[in-house]
Amino acid sequence: MAEDFVIEMLHITKEFPGIKANDDITLQLRKGEVHALLGENGAGKSTLMSVLFGLYQPEEGKILKNGKEVAIRNPNDANALGIGMVHQHFKLVECFSVLDNIILGVEPNKLGFLQKAEARKKVVALSEKYGLRVDPDALISDISVGMQQRVEILKMLYRDNEILIFDEPTAVLTPQEIDELMEIMRGFKKEGKSILFITHKLNEIMAVADRCTVLRKGKYMGTVDIKDTTKEELSRMMVGRDVQLQVDKKPAHPGDVVLDVEDVTIHNDQRKKDSVRDVTFQVHAGEIVCLAGIEGNGQTELVYGLTGLEKLSGGKITLDGKDITRESIRQRSKDGMSHIPEDRHKHGLVLDYSLENNMVLQRYWQPEFQKGGFIQSDKVREYSDKLIAQYDVRSGQGSSTIVRSMSGGNQQKAIIAREIDKDPKLLVAVQPTRGLDVGAIEYIHRQIVAERDKGKAVLLVSLELDEVMNLSDRILVMYEGEIVGEFDPKTTTVQELGLYMAGARKQGKESK
């Protein structure tokens, strides 16, 4: 019956040009439950939640709250109905304090004067009640990613939201912070709050959710009770086939040194400090070395230095015996370096170009694609069609598809196809599965292991500790711009890595 549900989204259809993101989807949320929303990348999960939060208007369908139809035209309407959302990419003002961010838009005032003391009192009370300890006066730019997420949660609680939407909330957290978040969700549930939880991590769904709704290609596949299902069954519902959840990987046989990084330092002029300090390591042919750590600890800057996007302040980089420290990005590519970037939109693709033009971004000047300075479109199309077939890149109009219209998983497949087909000596893969579903993750993991088995050197940068443990032959942990530990995945644990990632331990000091 309708009164059993605090929120009902009935027969929701949402269309974008050329695609039905949500096709007749029904989702019903009970009071006091954690309800997971699972689906492949591009299945329509975030779109559906954006409809509920008032960011999009559906073409068809209706939303009921406590059995009564409601109109949610914008996020203000959603907040007024007690619906709050923590987005995957936080919506915080970095130069504002924690307190200012929490009260932004709902500042208490009396006769036109801001009542900041009153707001502080409420924020402190909420943070103590829910175990979300924060410093109200700290600037957002000075606090950790895990702490920023607490601020986002407090924003919802400050607005007295009873229906809480979490969009991929654990993507940037340490194992210890993930455990804390799960405990916070359980606390909300005990209080009678209702939680919608978008995630692609099946173990988290099994740990905290009561029910799970599965979407596939914009359609509703079903809702299951977690106590009556398995991870394998959820994967099958999500992708329509059996999925290999563990990476099938033989022992590594490392060869010669391919990448040699010596005492690399990179100075951040904006923050007036070193973002990378005296980093030294090697990657051999036929092995996968993973850089693990919480986001913002120098991994991005180190990769920028390795790939030529950022200049070094000190140190030396050698690729297959050749000093490439001062070489251009194009020359590093010619020397045998491939790069799957962290931000596929900013550094991996030109979103308004066709798929075929994106496939030759690093090769269009080569003789096979141009003649007399003019690009040979038929050769580009032929090459792109080959990669699309070989790497199973799915898109609406094949090679002529504008990349912006493709799902994240297929955008990532296109980048991987382009970078692997260059036959590199070194593959630098930065968060290659971020935000992707189990089907796409399984595919990308297979490709990375296949490169290793062909004798390539692979440097993997990942925030996903399951991925780190499954794929790596060696693990390096970064904290505050330094490598604080090296580990064998066969002899370490996720909990031990978490302590090093949080700066609680450092090899050569506390631990060794």
What positions do the PLM features span?
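Glycine-rich phosphate-binding loops of nucleotide-dependent enzymes
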Residues: A2-K512
